[in-house]
From Swiss-Prot:
Keywords: Amino-acid biosynthesis, Cytoplasm, Glutamine amidotransferase, Histidine biosynthesis, Hydrolase, Lyase. Heterodimer of HisH and HisF. It is found in: Cytoplasm. This is Imidazole glycerol phosphate synthase subunit HisH. PANTHER family: IMIDAZOLE GLYCEROL PHOSPHATE SYNTHASE SUBUNIT HISH (PTHR42701:SF1).
Length: 211
């Protein structure tokens, strides 16, 4: 059965490359900001490039933060890519500007401390045991990153009632940051799977199978 993915159009992100990548792995893709379509599709993909503040303004302009919250409250799959991952956290700080995010995860997006920025190009990630996102992918696979900001320090609070997110990390120079998160219906990547060749295609295929 073909899965339908709503690709959220809120003025940020390379929609065409994400659409092609999803169609390549068998999804039916609708590029839209319509709340009903975004809420009822099998999956919702949230892209994002540029500044955290600008992305949040665009997202709120189409009520995207509410769409994400509504889907997750009902256990319906959402995936964020690049800044589309960053805005899922509590806040972002860029150029001294503090901006509130969607708040699905605690944590702060901040400037990386590496010498060479942006972090642009191919890099490996620290694949976690039991990962559905990276199923069928080896630990030496490389993924395409392009970013200056990220989540560098994330302390997970655990209790007996909830399952903590499965966090995949990456390192640029000596700076360690969150590369991907799996948290039930909510998945996200700092890298661009749609630009990551066969490995990225397999990851997107895993997400389509997950939804």
């Amino acid at each position: 059965m073909t899965k339908t993915v709503a690709l959220l159009d809120y003025g940020s992100g390379n929609l065409r490359s994400a659409q092609r990548a999803l169609e390549h792995v068998g999804a039916e893709v609708i590029v839209t900001s319509d709340p009903d379509i975004c809420t009822n599709a099998d999956g919702l993909l949230v892209p994002g490039v540029g500044a955290f503040d600008a992305c949040m303004k665009g997202l709120r302009g189409v009520f995207g933060h509410r769409i994400i919250g509504t889907r997750l409250a009902g256990g319906r799959p959402v995936m964020g890519i690049c800044v589309g991952m960053q805005i899922l956290f509590d806040e972002g700080i860029e150029h001294g500007i503090q901006t509130r995010g969607c708040g699905e995860w605690s944590g702060r997006v901040e400037r990386l401390q590496a010498r060479i920025l942006p972090h642009m190009g191919w890099n490996t990630v620290e694949k976690q045991p039991g990962s559905e996102m990276f199923a069928g992918l080896s630990e030496d696979e490389r993924y395409y990153f392009v970013h200056t900001y990220g989540v560098r320090d994330w302390t997970l609070v655990t209790d007996d009632l909830t399952t903590p997110p499965l966090v995949t990390w990456a390192v640029h120079e000596n700076d360690r940051f969150v590369a991907a998160v799996e948290n039930g219906a909510l998945w996200a990547t700092q890298f661009h799977p749609e630009k990551s060749g066969d490995a990225g295609a397999q990851l997107l295929r895993n997400w389509i199978n997950h939804i």
